[in-house]
């Protein structure tokens, strides 16, 4: 049975909540998944303001989840990944970028991740697909350099939710997503949570026969 690693960065509960729904979708399909958290660096940098350091500590303290820390060994151990990314200016946040740059150069040189399979889910501040789609496309540059095969969400399994113009939904064909609001205060809607479950299920259905 293939086992999926759901790899996230989440200082609040939004990406973590989405990850739990991706996991639920995998379990509905008969699979197993474990969630790992990227180490937080935002309050450790010497360039952070005192206000920024305190805000990051508070956000980290208030987060209502606890997962194992993601390491380079995790990437080697698992063959299937779902990456959860909170969009920052249409790209990885610093924590994700720091993890890739600091931990995976040797893996890239050895081709250790080549041929592994991944999907992506994201959160973005505002309604509209631009920032979340751009985040996924930019993240794919890293995956491509490592030779990781990307599996998009597409429209087949979530057509109703992706084409509904009456309900705000941060998902797109590239991957499931949610609109979190400028201050991160908007929780995922039932429609958005459903799309994440559908993506988890579809992803596992795709890999289980490989």
UniProtKB/Swiss-Prot annotation:
Statement: the UniProt record of this protein carries the keyword Cytoplasm: yes
Query: What does the record list as GO biological process?
Result: positive regulation of ferroptosis
Q: Kindly give the Pfam families that the UniProt entry links to this protein.
A: FMN_red
Q: Which residues form the Flavodoxin-like domain?
A: 4-203
One of the record's GO cellular component terms = membrane raft
**Leftover remarks:** Present with 7060 molecules/cell in log phase SD medium.
- Tell me the protein's name: Protein RFS1
- Recorded source organism is Saccharomyces cerevisiae (strain ATCC 204508 / S288c) (Baker's yeast)
Tell me the gene name: RFS1
């Amino acid at each position: 049975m293939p086992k999926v690693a759901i790899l996230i960065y989440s200082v609040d509960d939004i990406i973590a909540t989405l990850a739990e729904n991706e996991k639920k979708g995998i379990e509905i399909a008969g699979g197993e998944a474990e969630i790992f958290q990227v180490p937080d660096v935002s309050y450790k940098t010497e360039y952070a303001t005192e206000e920024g350091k305190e805000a990051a500590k508070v956000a980290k303290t208030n987060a209502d989840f606890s997962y194992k820390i993601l390491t380079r060994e995790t990437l080697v151990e698992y063959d299937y990944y779902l990456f959860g990314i909170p969009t920052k200016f249409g790209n990885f946040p610093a924590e994700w970028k720091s993890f890739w740059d600091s931990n995976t150069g040797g893996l890239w040189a050895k081709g250790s991740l080549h041929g592994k399979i991944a999907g992506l889910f994201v959160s973005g501040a505002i309604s509209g697909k631009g920032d979340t789609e751009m985040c996924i496309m930019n993240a794919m540059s890293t995956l491509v350099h490592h030779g990781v095969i990307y599996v998009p969400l597409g429209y087949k399994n979530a057509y109703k939710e992706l084409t509904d113009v009456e309900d705000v939904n941060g998902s797109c064909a590239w991957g499931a997503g949610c609109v979190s609001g400028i201050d991160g205060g908007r929780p995922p809607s039932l429609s958005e949570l459903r799309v994440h479950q559908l993506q988890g299920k579809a992803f596992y259905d795709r890999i289980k026969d490989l």
